[in-house]
Amino acid sequence: MTIKPVILETLPPDLDQQRLPQHVAVIMDGNGRWAKQRGMPRIMGHQRGVDSLKNLLRCCDDWGIAALTAYAFSTENWGRPLEEVEFLMTLFERVLRRELKEMMAENVRIRFVGNLTSLPRSLQDEIARSMEDTKNNTGIRFTVATNYGGRQEIVHVCQAIAREVQSGKLDPETIDEGVVEKYLYTEGLSHPDLLIRTSGELRISNFLLWQMAYAEIYVTSTLWPDFDRQAFHLALRDYQQRHRRFGKV
């Protein structure tokens, strides 16, 4: 994260600063295909994908977007080959350790959401350290969904609310959307305005099911390691051409 891209460093003139999404979420798909197309092992695609994520984070910060959430590892991803899963866990840990100083310098506030207790202990420690060290930063809010599943999150919310009702701390008649929000992993974070999915797949893959209720969805055939500022520019331009009605006329 030490060299800023010179291309599109500032907001492109055809984008309206006042109509930018304040929160962008991204499903980073296509790392394996990118590597396969080049005769490389899948893990090389994941390594290049890290660079794309770092560049997107900096781009959001440069262009005035307040929050970025990335789908790094789903609850279903444990079903991938063991070698790939172990590599990803090591990669997450190594990147966190390497980039923490830079995130502090750039005022990034990082947060991890998901079932973090199932991750390797050493990775849990790095996650806890990064969140603790950046918790008072006031710049872009960077959320990383790790061992995350939207259905699992909703089950977690139901269990938490049930315990509160059972203990007499919560009246069932008072349960509304606001109560549910308090028990989400993403509590306190605004809902995404724009979801970007790379690689052309037309599904949301169990990502932020509650939070995506009114998000605009943009799908690009670009594979994640190739997703750059120009590709992000196209996504934002498409977003600004839409009229968000939130269920109204």
Curated annotation (Swiss-Prot):
Entry binding sites for substrate: 30-34, 42, 46, 74-76, 78, 80, 197, 203-205
Record keywords: Magnesium, Metal-binding, Transferase
Residues the record lists as binding Mg(2+): 29, 216
Known cofactor(s): Mg(2+)
UniProt-recorded Gene Ontology molecular function terms: magnesium ion binding; prenyltransferase activity
Cofactor binding note from Swiss-Prot or TrEMBL: Binds 2 magnesium ions per subunit.
CDD domains in UniProt: Cis_IPPS (cd00475)
InterPro entries: UPP_synth-like, UPP_synth-like_CS, UPP_synth-like_sf
Active site: 29, 77
EC number: 2.5.1.-
Annotated PANTHER family: DEHYDRODOLICHYL DIPHOSPHATE SYNTHASE 2 (PTHR10291:SF0), DEHYDRODOLICHYL DIPHOSPHATE SYNTHASE FAMILY MEMBER (PTHR10291)
Function (record text): Catalyzes the condensation of isopentenyl diphosphate (IPP) with allylic pyrophosphates generating different type of terpenoids.
Sequence similarity: Belongs to the UPP synthase family.
Subunit structure, interactors included: Homodimer.
Protein name, UniProt field: Isoprenyl transferase
Protein species of origin: Synechocystis sp. (strain ATCC 27184 / PCC 6803 / Kazusa)
